[in-house]
């Protein structure tokens, strides 16, 4: 069975630059698509909690998947709550209720207090 022809090596995952240019065969440069992630924010929180600790790219990938998963769960639950109450807008109240439903005990309490603090900070900055 003949082996398929190998193309150029795949670009390295998780590179530092958001937009780089890949070389095409005919000499024209093409912009690589942006990969959105929470890595910058995960890193900032890590440095607040443990300033002398680093994180591997594999661990960062896991954290990114975790944040995406939790975001989707909360958004889905908040959407359901808005639908049940015949509302077309997801407010902080739906998010708060979704967090209370999804997260266990003490974790939910901490998440709600941090969320309330963030909303207060945002509204006071306006």
UniProtKB/Swiss-Prot annotation:
One of its GO terms (biological process) is innate immune response in mucosa. The modification N6-methyllysine is found at residues 47, 109. The nucleosome is a histone octamer containing two molecules each of H2A, H2B, H3 and H4 assembled in one H3-H4 heterotetramer and two H2A-H2B heterodimers. The octamer wraps approximately 147 bp of DNA. The modification N-acetylproline is found at residue 2. The modification N6-crotonyllysine is found at residues 6, 12-13, 16-17, 21, 24, 35. The modification PolyADP-ribosyl glutamic acid is found at residue 36. The modification Phosphothreonine is found at residue 116. Coiled coil: none annotated. The modification Omega-N-methylarginine is found at residues 87, 93. SMART domains: H2B. Belongs to the histone H2B family. InterPro entries: Histone-fold, Histone_H2A/H2B/H3, Histone_H2B, HISTONE_H2B_site. The keyword Kinase does not apply. The modification N6-succinyllysine is found at residues 35, 117, 121. The modification N6-lactoyllysine is found at residues 6, 12, 16-17, 21, 24, 44, 86, 109, 117, 121. GO terms for cellular component: cytosol; extracellular space; nucleoplasm; nucleosome; nucleus. Core component of nucleosome. Nucleosomes wrap and compact DNA into chromatin, limiting DNA accessibility to the cellular machineries which require DNA as a template. Histones thereby play a central role in transcription regulation, DNA repair, DNA replication and chromosomal stability. DNA accessibility is regulated via a complex set of post-translational modifications of histones, also called histone code, and nucleosome remodeling. The modification ADP-ribosylserine is found at residue 7. There is a cross-link at residues 6, 21 (Glycyl lysine isopeptide (Lys-Gly) (interchain with G-Cter in SUMO2)). The modification N6-malonyllysine is found at residue 117. It comes from Homo sapiens (Human). The modification N6,N6,N6-trimethyllysine is found at residue 86. The modification Phosphoserine is found at residues 15, 37. The modification N6-butyryllysine is found at residues 6, 21. This is Histone H2B type 1-K. The modification N6-glutaryllysine is found at residues 17, 35, 44, 47, 109, 117, 121. Monoubiquitination at Lys-35 (H2BK34Ub) by the MSL1/MSL2 dimer is required for histone H3 'Lys-4' (H3K4me) and 'Lys-79' (H3K79me) methylation and transcription activation at specific gene loci, such as HOXA9 and MEIS1 loci. Similarly, monoubiquitination at Lys-121 (H2BK120Ub) by the RNF20/40 complex gives a specific tag for epigenetic transcriptional activation and is also prerequisite for histone H3 'Lys-4' and 'Lys-79' methylation. It also functions cooperatively with the FACT dimer to stimulate elongation by RNA polymerase II. Phosphorylation at Ser-37 (H2BS36ph) by AMPK in response to stress promotes transcription. Phosphorylated on Ser-15 (H2BS14ph) by STK4/MST1 during apoptosis; which facilitates apoptotic chromatin condensation. Also phosphorylated on Ser-15 in response to DNA double strand breaks (DSBs), and in correlation with somatic hypermutation and immunoglobulin class-switch recombination.
């Amino acid at each position: 069975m003949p082996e398929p022809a190998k193309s150029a090596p795949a670009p390295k995952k998780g590179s530092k630059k958001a937009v780089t240019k890949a070389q095409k065969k005919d000499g024209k440069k093409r912009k690589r698509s942006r990969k959105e992630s929470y890595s910058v924010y995960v890193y900032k929180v890590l440095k607040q909690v443990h300033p002398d600790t680093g994180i591997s790219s594999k661990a960062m990938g896991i954290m990114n998947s975790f944040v995406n998963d939790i975001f989707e769960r909360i958004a889905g639950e908040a959407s359901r709550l808005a639908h049940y109450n015949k509302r077309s807008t997801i407010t902080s109240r739906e998010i708060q209720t979704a967090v209370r439903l999804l997260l266990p005990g003490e974790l939910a309490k901490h998440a709600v207090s941090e969320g309330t603090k963030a909303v207060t900070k945002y509204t006071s900055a306006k």
